UniProtKB/Swiss-Prot annotation:
GO terms for biological process: cobalamin biosynthetic process; methylation. Its EC number is 2.1.1.196. It catalyses: Co-precorrin-6B + S-adenosyl-L-methionine = Co-precorrin-7 + S-adenosyl-L-homocysteine + CO2. It comes from Salmonella typhi. This is Cobalt-precorrin-6B C(15)-methyltransferase (decarboxylating). The keyword Glycosyltransferase does not apply. The gene is cbiT.
């Protein structure tokens, strides 16, 4: 989905189109029935997942009041009745397990969020995280190794977009984004 389709607001983050496409692919939602989107922002990941997989139940968690309003407006705009919005900050108490968890950031609670996400995944469930900070990348990778996550994969996405400049065009660079994906396997993720 094009980024321009989503309602946006100042200081409300959105997972961009190319990053979203890669993250959704790595979540392997074709075999999922429940996705948790932590720090849903505008809802771009939740909405694209819900539209691609209409039988998927999506739980979108967001703490920012401005983002919650945009998330709800975008959910209504795209008529996504399969998205439940949970106001609040993860880690939080929620019932049930998921087949996939997406984290678009950590809010300063990275290892606690990873543990929380793994605890809410069914065996075989997928966790996908995106970061722009190198420190978060290294901390996440080290913690995932420590807890025994399986099928770990990491990609750095560096995109540039063709942009007008005077009478010509140039490729305007975007910041690199790190995408980490892993899986919870039964008897492979140790209790902390």
């Amino acid at each position: 989905m094009k980024d321009e389709l989503f309602l946006r607001g100042e200081n409300v983050p959105m997972t961009k189109e190319a990053v979203r496409a890669l993250a959704l692919s790595k979540l392997e939602l074709h075999r999922a029935s429940h996705l948790i989107d932590v720090g849903a922002g505008t809802g771009s990941v939740s909405i694209e997942a819900a539209l691609q997989f209409p039988s998927l139940q999506v739980t979108a968690i967001e703490r920012n009041p401005a983002a919650l309003r945009l998330l709800d407006e975008n959910r209504q705009r795209f008529a996504c009745g399969n998205i439940d919005i949970l106001p609040g900050e993860a880690p939080m108490t929620i019932t049930g397990k998921a087949d996939a968890v997406f984290m678009g950031g950590s809010g300063g609670h990275l290892t606690a969020l990873i543990d929380w996400a793994m605890g809410h995944l069914h065996p075989g469930g997928r966790l996908v995280m995106t970061f722009i900070l190198q420190e978060n990348l290294h901390s996440a990778l080290a913690h995932l190794v420590h807890i025994g996550a399986c099928r770990m994969d990491c990609v750095q996405l560096q995109l540039s977009s063709l942009t007008p400049l005077g009478a010509g065009h140039y490729f305007k660079p975007n910041n690199p984004v790190f995408v980490i994906a892993c899986q919870k396997e039964e008897n492979h993720v140790r209790d902390i």
